[in-house]
């Protein structure tokens, strides 16, 4: 293969490692008709050096075995409550900043754009809080993280497994030391289309301007899977709409498995081998195996996949934790064993989206083509 432009869409995870490594500027990331970004090669600039192929994680994914597993929660109740799970990510991020380091994580930009950003102060860490069920745009962060590491900074990078593996491949190809790097991936269901989410926020904004959208809140507490996700939209006039059909609609799209990136249905990272130093998730099943540690305000599952991660974990002062087993950790984590499966209505879903728009595809409960009036549900 002479360049990554020849990869099928099912093989491309959109991590931007190829774009970041190309010194000729021959690669740009362009959205397709589903709203996912893929590398586009300028043949006039490409020298067929092969760097983009060498840095592509999909062609040679790397995995690490978990060496320890923990349940954890932040000792500060407000930090725990404002986090999606137990607040471990917040505790780790604060630790890195306290050491003079920088944190790369996913934030909402102007409500509807999901991007990976660089944070170097405690005051800005709240931007990274909360799940974002959309594929992020890494922007220039691989290059920025590489520059920070070369400068000697302590760097933490949060992302999906494919994103993290792409970063590691990029740094390896650039011969940049990763001794000051700690990576954190997620047990990932799959990444939905950014275009779908942007259209969804535009749809919500027809009612009145949207100030913020929360993919998950703890309005119903935590611990019982998606039934307690309680997504919420905050409008500019202060109105907060939570757990209503209009806010649940995007969550239902996400779990329908119709709007995930094609690569997600064949994801090589949906397995017990991990791509990062830490893997974090909700500790689903804690009430079954560790009822004494259950907390309705959230508990994080933390997989330790390297000695680097174990050393950092042992130095964290702002968490309460308990050790568990891999069997318990994986019990309620289906995507730790297999990728999400493509919905049988997938082709019809995209046809309807392109022909009829976002409002039409938001109506079904699980995309069985039942309209809202047929299910007895109304969006507003």
PLM regions and their residue ranges:
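Iron-sulfur cluster-binding cysteine motifs and their immediate structural context
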Residues: 9-11, 17-40, 51-67, 277-278
């Amino acid at each position: 293969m002479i360049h990554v432009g020849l990869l099928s869409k099912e093989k491309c995870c959109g991590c931007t490692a190829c774009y970041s490594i190309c010194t000729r500027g021959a690669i740009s990331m362009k959205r397709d008709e589903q709203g996912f970004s893929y590398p586009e090669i300028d043949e006039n600039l490409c020298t067929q050096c092969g760097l983009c192929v060498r840095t592509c994680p999909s062609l040679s994914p790397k995995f690490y075995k978990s060496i320890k597993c923990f349940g954890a929660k932040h000792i500060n109740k407000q930090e725990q409550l404002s986090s999606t799970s137990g607040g471990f990510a917040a505790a780790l991020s604060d630790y890195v900043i306290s050491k003079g380091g920088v944190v790369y994580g996913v934030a909402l930009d102007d409500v509807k754009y999901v991007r990976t950003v660089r944070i170097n102060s405690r005051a800005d860490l709240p931007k990274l809080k909360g799940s974002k069920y959309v594929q992020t745009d890494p922007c220039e962060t691989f290059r920025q993280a590489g520059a920070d590491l070369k400068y000697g900074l302590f760097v933490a990078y949060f992302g999906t497994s494919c994103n993290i593996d792409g970063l590691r491949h990029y740094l390896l190809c650039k011969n940049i030391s990763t001794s000051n790097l700690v990576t954190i991936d997620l047990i990932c269901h799959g990444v939905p289309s950014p275009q779908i989410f942007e259209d969804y926020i535009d749809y919500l904004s027809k009612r009145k301007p949207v100030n913020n959208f929360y993919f998950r809140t703890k309005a119903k507490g935590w611990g019982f899977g998606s039934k307690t996700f309680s997504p919420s939209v905050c409008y500019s006039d202060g109105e907060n709409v939570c757990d209503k059909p209009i806010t649940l609609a995007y969550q239902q799209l996400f779990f329908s498995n119709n709007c995930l990136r094609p690569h997600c249905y064949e994801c090589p990272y949906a397995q017990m081998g991990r791509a990062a130093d830490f893997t974090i998730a909700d500790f689903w099943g804690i009430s079954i195996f560790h009822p004494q540690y259950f907390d309705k305000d959230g508990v994080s599952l933390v997989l330790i996949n390297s000695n680097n991660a174990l050393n950092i974990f042992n130095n964290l002062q702002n968490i309460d934790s308990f050790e568990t087993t891999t069997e318990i950790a994986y019990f309620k984590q289906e995507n730790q064993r297999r990728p999400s499966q493509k919905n049988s209505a997938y082709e019809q879903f995209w046809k309807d989206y392109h022909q009829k728009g976002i409002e039409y595809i938001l109506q079904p409960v699980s995309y069985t083509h039942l309209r809202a009036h047929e299910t007895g549900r109304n969006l507003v």
